[in-house]
């Protein structure tokens, strides 16, 4: 089955303190998205679509694209590589972007920018997260079961495997019904492991609500068919129409759209659970830990000495 891996890499890592999407972190300078690409191709994916800022094109081709040119799919074919640009030129003409706005419009707009390149079932992920080998195998198999419209899937991770020792994180806390289907995702903005070993939302105070370690959370690892693009387009336009004049930071987020479609009965999303250790670089201080974990995976033979052909 042909399937596309769509990687969102245009965002600015403000808390991280740099461009974490292209920060070399593997033993040979690999960046985190190279591990996702490697795992996806092994699982059966046939196309990679990078969503980037236009000025990142040369950098991305040099760091990742040129290595992909030598890679093959699981069937021995060449990997199709596409670059989609997320910038303000793709915003509908009826909306005038404030001249002071720098921040991109969020994950709905990002995915919408890849529309012309995606004509097959696809998975969309963050560029700066490590998702684990088995997660790609599981979601690839699930993609083949999706109807042409009205169905999707996601990988849910245990909350305890997704927090940082160096500060709070934002996670999409998933409410899953008895049938293993997603009811809703609640964006929770200040999750932190505390001194007593419990994970709390400390948005209001240090003794905020406690979350169970195995609480399923979304790390933006979604699977859909191209049917979703019509919904993305309509939702983004409604978002822009509702923005106050001069708004500089508000984003249009994929989990919000998915929740609305579920509430309207237009979408059902299966939740695939993963007990894998997710890791990423929310903060610059996370880098050393991620480097250690990746080296362990190479040493254990999960990955070859180098990911670059």
Predicted segment positions?
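Conserved N-terminal catalytic core of the sugar/cofactor nucleotidyltransferase
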Residues: 1-4, 27-124, 131-132, 136, ...
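N-terminal nucleotide-binding beta1-loop-alpha1 segment
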Residues: 1-19, 23
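Hydrophobic packing residues within well-ordered alpha-helices of enzyme cores
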Residues: 60-64, 139, 232, 290
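Short, surface-exposed amphipathic charged segments that create phosphate/polyanion-binding patches used
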Residues: 93-103, 167-172, 285-289
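Conserved core of the sugar-phosphate nucleotidyltransferase
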Residues: 133-222
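Conserved nucleotide-sugar donor-binding
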Residues: 221-232
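A C-terminal functional module that forms or caps the active site or interfaces directly
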Residues: 232-267
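Generic C-terminus detector
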Residues: 286-309
